[in-house]
């Protein structure tokens, strides 16, 4: 059994500074790293690291090992859009090393064969040689340029400094076609997580394993649940989430998650809003403040241990990946245990710069062993 993650993959380019930068000056970074990132992607990488740690507890696995962790049947699946070109190839290689299997649902570039008057198009065939000359319009040339342009992935540039960080990102910009990889999706998974950055990918992931229903009842498919739990990573509200919420079983949201009907992101109101869609299990992270939860009628808070000199890039993603890993193993009966484990893993993630160094921390291995 494994987990399915669906959502955004970006190239994360991270710089660290030892001072707050002056916007008018060029500065030299004190540290630098580059890796595949994005909410669902970082969560999948976290899950893979925890899974590798669990396998290492077995003597046989530790001795035998695996030459390619991404080919293992229990490696997490990432349904995403990597795009084309050298940047995409780098991200694919990075994720393979991290032990993540990728299902790339990028829509292929359209051909230009249907654009009249352009070289290589149907209009330039011998059969139409005698036809009147059709001169391409600027719109035709623009369409041809777009068709031939590589499908480049999203890129995020992050500068981390003592007072915080600055992020510039293209966000999701690739068209996706989940049907292209539908045959590669497993029949069963242990748990699903979506980050909501691409509604088509989210829809495909959330409806995986949902039994077919007949009749004219519009709510029948919402009530026909799969055997696994489906988790929403709600970093922020996205307008296309509304029709998807009925397929979600657990929502893990940040304090920035504010549905448009609410005047402000109040935790109780957010939980009530989600409850209206049938989501009775809500976890709300708030940085260094205690994590709140509303779980099948119960409500509480779980303290978060402060980490000095924290590098918080990807901390929320690590929390989500660890939460999913624990949820798959322990089920949904004890939310505080799930939150404590996920918070501890997130605490390890902020103890070093970037989104990869911490994965080999002995503290992480001890958390897996204690679990």
Where are these regions (language model features)?
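A short, glycine/small-residue-rich beta-strand->loop->alpha-helix junction that serves as a flexible
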Residues: 31-39
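Positively charged, low-complexity intrinsically disordered leader regions
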Residues: 1-23
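Conserved phosphate-binding/catalytic region of the ribokinase-like
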Residues: 266-371
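Short acidic active-site motifs
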Residues: 177-181, 201, 239-241, 269-270
């Amino acid at each position: 059994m494994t987990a399915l993650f669906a959502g955004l993959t970006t190239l994360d380019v991270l710089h660290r500074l030892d001072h707050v930068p002056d916007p008018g000056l060029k500065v030299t970074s004190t540290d630098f790293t580059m890796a595949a990132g994005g909410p669902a992607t970082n969560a999948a990488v976290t899950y893979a690291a925890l899974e590798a740690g669990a396998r290492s507890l077995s003597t046989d696995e530790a001795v035998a090992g695996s030459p390619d962790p991404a080919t293992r049947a229990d490696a997490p699946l990432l349904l995403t859009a990597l795009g084309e070109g050298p940047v995409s190839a780098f991200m694919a290689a990075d994720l393979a090393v991290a032990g993540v299997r990728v299902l790339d649902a990028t829509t292929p570039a359209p051909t230009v064969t249907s654009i009249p008057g352009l070289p290589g198009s149907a209009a330039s065939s011998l059969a139409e040689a005698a036809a009147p000359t059709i001169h391409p319009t600027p719109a035709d040339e623009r369409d041809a340029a777009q068709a031939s342009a590589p499908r480049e992935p999203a890129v995020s540039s992050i500068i981390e400094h003592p007072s915080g960080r600055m992020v510039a990102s293209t966000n999701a910009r690739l068209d996706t076609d989940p049907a292209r990889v539908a045959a590669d999706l497993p029949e069963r998974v242990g748990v699903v997580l979506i980050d909501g950055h691409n509604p088509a990918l989210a829809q495909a992931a959330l409806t995986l394993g949902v039994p077919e229903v007949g009749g004219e009842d519009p709510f029948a498919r919402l009530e026909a649940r799969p055997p696994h739990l489906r988790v929403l990573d709600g970093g922020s509200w996205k307008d296309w989430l509304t029709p998807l919420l009925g397929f979600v079983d657990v929502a893990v949201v940040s304090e920035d998650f504010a549905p448009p009907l609410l005047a402000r992101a109040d935790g109780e109101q957010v939980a009530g809003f989600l409850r209206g869609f049938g989501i009775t299990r809500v976890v709300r992270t708030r940085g260094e403040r205690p994590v709140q939860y509303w779980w099948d009628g119960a409500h509480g808070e779980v303290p978060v241990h402060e980490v000095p000199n924290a590098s918080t890039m990807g901390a929320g993603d690590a929390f989500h990946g660890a939460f999913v890993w624990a949820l798959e193993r322990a089920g949904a009966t004890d939310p505080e245990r799930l939150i404590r484990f996920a918070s501890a893993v997130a605490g390890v993630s902020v103890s070093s710069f970037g989104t990869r160094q911490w994965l080999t921390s002995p503290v992480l291995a001890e958390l897996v062993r204690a679990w």
